[in-house]
């Protein structure tokens, strides 16, 4: 994994006779520069990664030797000359390949001379690939530059290696997009990258060649996997969405998303109607239904039918009434095919097919399908009859019975000021 880039001697001068073709010493080493490359573009762009496993065209590796590892990304240059470091004559080394400067620029790599600000001349650069794993440094232009395998033990933090990401360290000081930079600075990403690949305290020299090759292959794709899994990353990185709480009725199995709705539903099975109208004695399960019901005992009917002129106290009642003129009966009984304008009437009719009459009178044992029918029946056992005929003064428990009485006996159609029709068959459901 240890490699470096350096200038060919042909660019900076021919090798001297005293050195015998070795690299020419220089007062300062060449520095790695990303800022110059990034400054040429108006907007920061992500830097493409080099192909770490494909040898240059025309340069085949010997079949008998193991496949060498590319490490084209130099880390932070350090001035260190430990005696165990291997000094390599890069010009004569068999594992060097010539690269054109344009090819290096295309992958985002560039060298600049610290003594001058000018861009390097277009020429030939040398890419050194280590023959063995422990070839971790070499003398470039007379100064020791440590790269990936700096030291005998595990790679030290001062070498600029970001969490054993050999391709990530040089990106931290570049004007990358914030999302790209966060992929390298995230602590979770760092911990996950090292967990299974490089045990702590293990030297790179102790790792097998195949292990390093496998690690480099995974590291090369670590960024692309994170960048292009946008949707999956947002889903997986966020906290798991908890399912909404549900409340199930133990009697009928109906499911509600709030406990309040379940509480409102339970009187359907118990038959309790604690909210009673003081005018007609009709009971309701909810206080809001009772408030709407009280309107029928007033003379306020702002909603009128355009076809027959009949007035209603609520717009919903008018909408239901218009179905009569249109002949629209959306609620069809699946047993007999009879249609109904209102859903409440449809439900009441279905009970006639089942024969079930669970609401019984405690006095006469008469049974009813609906609890509101039992409520009206109870008026027959007392003297309370809220609906009175204006002509003869006869009282009725229900407004429906009063209207029938007026039409049959007095031959008068109910006018706008006649007692309004209760809507208990729909409101109490």
From Swiss-Prot:
* Example GO BP: cell differentiation
Give any Pfam family that matches: zf-C2H2
Tell me where it mainly resides: nucleus
Q: Which Gene3D superfamilies does the entry mention?
A: Classic Zinc Finger (3.30.160.60)
Q: What residue spans carry the region label Disordered?
A: 409-429
- Where does this one sit in the cell? Nucleus
User: Which InterPro entries does its entry note?
Assistant: Zinc_finger, Znf_C2H2_sf, Znf_C2H2_type
Query: A Gene Ontology CC term for this entry?
Result: nucleus
Where in this protein would one find the motif Engrailed homology 1 repressor, according to its record? 29-44
Q: Where is the signal peptide?
A: none
GO MF annotation: an example: RNA polymerase II cis-regulatory region sequence-specific DNA binding
Family the UniProt entry places it in:
Belongs to the krueppel C2H2-type zinc-finger protein family.
What this protein is reported to do is described as: Transcription repressor. Involved in the development of the forebrain region.
The name on file for this protein is Fez family zinc finger protein 1
Give the source species.
Danio rerio
Which lineage?
Answer: Eukaryota, Metazoa, Chordata, Craniata, Vertebrata
The primary gene name is fezf1
